[in-house]
UniProtKB/Swiss-Prot annotation:
Family in the record: Belongs to the AspA/AstE family. Aspartoacylase subfamily.
MF terms in GO: aspartoacylase activity; hydrolase activity, acting on ester bonds; metal ion binding
Cofactor binding note from Swiss-Prot or TrEMBL: Binds 1 zinc ion per subunit.
Binding-site list for Zn(2+): 21, 24, 116
Descriptive protein name: Aspartoacylase
Amino acid sequence: MTSCHIAEEPIKKVAIFGGTHGNELTGVFLVKHWLENGAEIQRTGLEVKPFITNPRAVKKCTRYIDCDLNRIFDLENLGKKMSEDLPYEVRRAQEIYHLFGPKDGEDSYDIIFDLHNTTSNMGCTLILEDSRNNFLIQMFHYIKTSLAPLPCYVYLIEHPSLKYATTRSIAKCPVGIEVGPQPQGVLRADILDQMRKMIKHALDFIHHFNEGKEFPPCAIEVYKIIEKVDYPRDENGEIAAVIHPNLQDQDWKPLHPGDPMFLTLDGKTMPLGGDCTVYPVFVNEAAYYEKKEAFAKTTKLMLNAKSIRCSVH
């Protein structure tokens, strides 16, 4: 009996981005290594290109020079007339777009893995932008299964107003890889090993797929963003409370109505309101202070993928 599956085109071109944020050093370190010796990321019949996305920020070990490269891959910025007056990252975004995009172009990259670190206690995290992408749900299922018993979480940023224009979004299949906790400007061996394994399993999945392996229907648990929460602020806009100790480092754990969220300097606890349990992520992320984000609320749900198989086999 012939199984019912979705026939997908073979994957031909993959890019691995490091240094989208220049002080998130695991991706920088790995990509620089793979540029020197890329044997471990090569797979038969697959073009895999490691790439430093924001070299100036990497050189200065800072998140960005003029603006956040991972927020400006929208039509407005990509369509601006190139000039020296443009912010460095906008010019760089246009260069990257022409090298790796456009999303549905004939020569565009099939998959871009964008490597990030977080100061939050998020462990191994895969970031998904489209809940209907059978191929990526299958890939994430494979990565999660391969990493077990090490947990690997899936963060779904599909949202009408909270989704942002990522560097990787120019690929047909964009994949964010976020591993922490790791301070900015620091390398940790355990975090590096985890990210390296995530890339290995992802490339193995692509190789098996291209070789004709059929992946049966699967389901994965994901955490979908529903709201970003700012710190409490005083009348001057200054932060008036910090993340409560009970919430610190509790990414992915349930936060119930009435549970402590923030703590003021005079000892007052500010609890979660409403009547819904949420799952916080990016708790107390250092890079998000400037974005006025103390953490993001997510809701937990299941995503299903149909069986897939490469169309050339």
